[in-house]
Amino acid sequence: MNLKEKIRVIEGFPKEGISFKDITTVLNDKEALKYTVDAIVEHLKDKNVDVVVGPEARGFLFGTPVAYALGAAFVPVRKKGKLPCETISSEYDLEYGSDVLQIHKDAIKKGQKVAIVDDLLATGGTMNSVIEMIEKLGGEVVSVDFLIELTDLKGREKIGNYDIMSLVQYDI
């Protein structure tokens, strides 16, 4: 399946100069959604994944069914103040300013094999924060998987030496 054909591209959203990749068209197409989840599962099936981590919010959409298919646990990474128990945090830079992500302190056990699943790789800032927290808790990141990668932003290079997979690539 050509997933790129299933992703709606909206020019000038949310502001002029942005080419927005709308994944809702993948989510509401049952064949495209199944293909996406199955392709990520296929990439991860031999990695003995214990935990799938999904960053807020669209990482939840793909990470949860991937975890289910692998027989793994799912752990959400949330924005600051959204998790009820003790957390660890990581700050990352945005275009203007910064933001903070958090994960429950007891969500990842030392030595667990972790796959991170998200919708889009852009600059790599969010993913570096997620990786930092997982490794701080003792998890081993075995793969980082995306539906979309914006290759011109070089997020893959900024993430570094991890197994990184994306299903669709765009040069922006």
Curated annotation (Swiss-Prot):
The pathway to which it is assigned is:
Purine metabolism; AMP biosynthesis via salvage pathway; AMP from adenine: step 1/1
In short, the EC number is 2.4.2.7
Recorded GO molecular functions are: adenine binding; adenine phosphoribosyltransferase activity; AMP binding
**Enzyme class per UniProt:** transferase
Alphabetically ordered keywords of this record: Cytoplasm, Glycosyltransferase, Purine salvage, Transferase
- Principal place where this protein is found? cytoplasm
User: Per the record, what are the reactions this protein catalyses?
Assistant: AMP + diphosphate = 5-phospho-alpha-D-ribose 1-diphosphate + adenine
Among Gene3D superfamilies, the record links this protein to: 3.40.50.2020
Q: Which Pfam families match?
A: Pribosyltran
- Report the superkingdom from the record: Bacteria
SUPFAM superfamilies for the chain = PRTase-like
Q: Where in the cell is it found?
A: Cytoplasm
Q: Which InterPro entries match?
A: Ade_phspho_trans, PRibTrfase_dom, PRTase-like, UPRTase/APRTase
Q: Which chain regions cross the lipid bilayer?
A: none
Q: Which GO terms describe its cellular component?
A: cytoplasm
One GO term under biological process is: AMP salvage
Provide the assembly information: Homodimer.
Family indicated by similarity: Belongs to the purine/pyrimidine phosphoribosyltransferase family.
Alphabetized HAMAP family for the sequence: Aden_phosphoribosyltr
Function of the protein: Catalyzes a salvage reaction resulting in the formation of AMP, that is energically less costly than de novo synthesis.
Q: Write the protein's name.
A: Adenine phosphoribosyltransferase
| Native species | Clostridium novyi (strain NT)
Gene symbol? Answer: apt
